[in-house]
Regions:
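Short, Lys/Arg-enriched N-terminal segments with co-localized hydrophobic residues
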Residues: 1-8
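Glycine-rich N-terminal segment of FAD-binding domains in flavoprotein oxidoreductases
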Residues: 23-122, 129-137, 224, 338, ...
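Short, conserved charged micro-motifs
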Residues: 40-43, 102, 208, 235, ...
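Structural signature of FAD isoalloxazine-binding scaffolds in flavoprotein oxidoreductases
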Residues: 61-80, 135-157, 181-188
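Non-transmembrane, aqueous-exposed alpha-helical and coiled segments at domain scale
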Residues: 87, 108, 154, 351-352, ...
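C-terminal substrate-binding/cap subdomain adjacent to the FAD-binding core in PCMH-type
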Residues: 148-328, 332, 340
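Substrate-recognition/cap regions that form aromatic- and gly/pro-loop-enriched pockets
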Residues: 288-408
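Activity-critical C-terminal alpha-helical subdomain
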Residues: 385-439
Length: 439
């Protein structure tokens, strides 16, 4: 409550500075607010010259940074159930700060499913959507593509509700936190389904060159794990969609790759206890689409990540470029992952998925200086192909030349105008987003 002109019990000033999950970034915020209700949130926004929502802190760059107050919604209660599934429309309304793994249990209990999930269930809904985070699958879009509505608090502390059909929604879904503090997200669901996960090992590069489209079309969601060395793809994870109760089957040979006979972790030699069940054992979508289980911490954060979203028609050129960089990249990698993403059904202004895309993802060892030296060369090879850096991961261009990234998005000026309208005083600017919008 308010007492003597200051917000009591809401802001931890003087607390140790927050760091992100990976530990590679210490945020610049001067305090952290944990508003308990809409009134407290509006008050924090109005009182702060600079303010920014902070999610599960799984971004590797400074997309969510601010010099002012960070807002964390872990104690926020808008008087509604955190997860509400509308039985008529199938739309699920979600408290924005929740993690996907917590949301999906409720959705599954209601007999519904989200079409896709990211590899980690530990990430917040609002933060994932705002950065166009994604899983894999030729026919399934990013997490942002499921959004049909948003509620947010904008620069003057007022509330906005956007739904499908509102002119602002396509600009507000992938918004990098620049329009306000999102408090609720509405997601489309589908009837529940099961998934079986089969892993193949030892896919030669020749097979990737000749049969990539067939490989990615062979299951609902396909991920290729490689270190970009001469040996090719070490593991292919194939997640096949089944009707509940159906068992499905696998294939003995996958263009030279053979079925794994034990559970595997994407990183060689790591205990797969953290991973979702493989070996063709069917289970509900929410326990198979992520690579990692919610009840295990997937790693201690001792890693860095980059990712480039390449137009699908240029994928083979991107693979060739990465293989050429192999001698420099492989020694720094924990693992690389290649995924596919379907285009957004309705264009989202700052989404990299305006057409079919292939994600070239890199999980680096925690060697920030070495990674920083190789990123410019990787981007010099990939960005001319039309690749866009993932908004939440490490990128040389996002830090040093955000204008070059802005130029990859035809609607970026419209987005800037939208941000100006929702936040005329620039309260929600910070990190690279400020430089991106400064043009």
């Amino acid at each position: 409550g308010l007492e003597g002109g200051k917000v009591v019990g809401v802001t931890d000033f003087g607390a140790p500075r927050l760091a992100n999950w990976a530990g590679n970034l210490t945020y610049g915020s001067s305090g952290v607010a944990h508003p308990a209700n809409p009134e407290e949130l509006a008050d924090v926004v109005r009182r702060s010259a600079r303010v920014k929502a902070l999610g599960s802190r799984h971004s590797f760059g400074d997309v969510a940074d601010t010099t002012g107050t960070h807002v964390v919604l872990d104690r926020y209660d808008d008087g509604r159930a955190p997860v509400e599934v509308d039985p008529a429309s199938g739309v699920v309304s979600v408290a924005a700060g929740l993690r996907y793994g917590d949301v999906t249990r409720h959705v599954q209990a209601a007999g519904r499913a989200l079409a896709n999930l990211a590899s980690l269930p530990h990430i917040s809904v609002a933060g994932s959507v705002a950065t166009a985070t994604h899983g894999s699958g030729d026919a399934v879009g990013s997490l942002a593509s499921a959004v049909v509505g948003l509620e947010l608090v904008i620069g003057d502390g007022g509330r906005r509700t956007l739904r499908r059909g509102d002119a602002d929604l396509p600009g507000a879904v992938v918004a990098l936190g620049a329009l306000g503090v999102v408090t609720r997200v509405e997601l489309e669901t589908v009837p529940t389904f099961d998934v079986r996960q089969d892993v193949h090992v030892g896919l030669p590069w020749d097979a990737v060159t000749a049969h990539y489209d067939e490989i990615t079309a062979s299951a609902y969601s396909v991920s290729l794990f490689t270190d970009w060395g001469p040996d090719g793809v070490q593991q292919v994870w194939r997640k096949s969609r089944l009707a509940p109760g159906e068992r499905g089957g696998t294939r003995a040979d996958l263009f030279g790759a053979t079925p794994a006979t034990t559970m595997l972790h994407p990183l060689p030699g790591i205990d797969p206890v953290h991973c979702t069940p493989q070996l063709g054992e069917p289970g509900p979508w929410n326990e198979r689409l992520p690579h990692f289980r919610l009840d295990f911490t997937p790693s201690n954060g001792a890693e860095l990540q980059s990712e480039y979203l390449v137009p699908r028609g240029r994928a083979q050129e991107a693979f060739a470029a990465m293989r050429d960089l192999g001698p420099r990249v492989t020694p720094l990698l924990q693992v690389g992952e290649i995924r596919t993403v379907a285009p957004d059904p309705e264009p989202l202004w700052l989404s990299p998925f305006d057409g079919p895309a292939v994600g070239v993802h890199l999980t680096w060892k925690p060697l920030p200086d070495d990674v920083a030296r190789v990123l410019p060369d990787a981007e010099a090879a990939l960005l001319p192909l039309g690749a866009r850096p993932h908004w939440g991961k490490l990128s040389h261009a996002l830090v040093h030349d955000p204008g070059s990234v802005a130029a990859l998005y035809p609607r970026v000026d419209d987005f800037g105008a939208l941000a100006q309208r929702y936040d005329p005083e620039g309260r929600f600017l910070g990190g690279y987003v400020e430089r991106l919008l400064a043009g």
